Amino acid sequence: MFVLSGYEYLLVFLIVCALLPVLALGASALLAPKRRGSLRRSTYESGMEPFGQAWIQFNIRYYMFALVFVIFDVETVFLYPWAVAFHRLGLLAFVEALIFIAILVVGLVYAWRKGALEWS
């Protein structure tokens, strides 16, 4: 009898996971055109000819809004499974979720007071 009787599927899965990217890259190398023309070296920007410089400095406010968005996006990711299983989790999980939301509200108030949410 085979010793790893419960792990054959895992072994096959790992082999397929290792071979699939290798096969995809190999097929790409075989099927890709070998010549590099002038169009290959040109810049592509949404189907239009690029204009202006590529290196421009963004306002730091974009990053602040992005960070606040990511924080509340992660909050949604954490709270959705909690909301789905709310009835089975009980009072302790409800209190933990309230503490989590309170910490995020404190962070939002801090960002608001520091002016991170104002554009001017």
Curated annotation (Swiss-Prot):
It catalyses: a plastoquinone + NADH + (n+1) H(+)(in) = a plastoquinol + NAD(+) + n H(+)(out); a plastoquinone + NADPH + (n+1) H(+)(in) = a plastoquinol + NADP(+) + n H(+)(out). It is a multi-pass membrane protein. GO terms for biological process: photosynthesis, light reaction. Pfam families: Oxidored_q4. It is found in: Cellular thylakoid membrane. InterPro entries: NAD(P)H_OxRDtase_bac/plastid (IPR023043), NADH_UbQ/plastoQ_OxRdtase_su3 (IPR000440), NDAH_ubi_oxred_su3_sf (IPR038430). One of its GO terms (molecular function) is quinone binding. The keyword Metal-binding does not apply. Its EC number is 7.1.1.-. Keywords: Membrane, NAD, NADP, Plastoquinone, Quinone, Thylakoid, Translocase, Transmembrane, Transmembrane helix, Transport. GO terms for cellular component: NADH dehydrogenase complex; plasma membrane-derived thylakoid membrane. The chain crosses the membrane at residues 10-30, 64-84, 89-109. NDH-1 shuttles electrons from an unknown electron donor, via FMN and iron-sulfur (Fe-S) centers, to quinones in the respiratory and/or the photosynthetic chain. The immediate electron acceptor for the enzyme in this species is believed to be plastoquinone. Couples the redox reaction to proton translocation, and thus conserves the redox energy in a proton gradient. Cyanobacterial NDH-1 also plays a role in inorganic carbon-concentration. HAMAP family: NDH1_NuoA. NDH-1 can be composed of about 15 different subunits; different subcomplexes with different compositions have been identified which probably have different functions. Belongs to the complex I subunit 3 family. This is NAD(P)H-quinone oxidoreductase subunit 3.
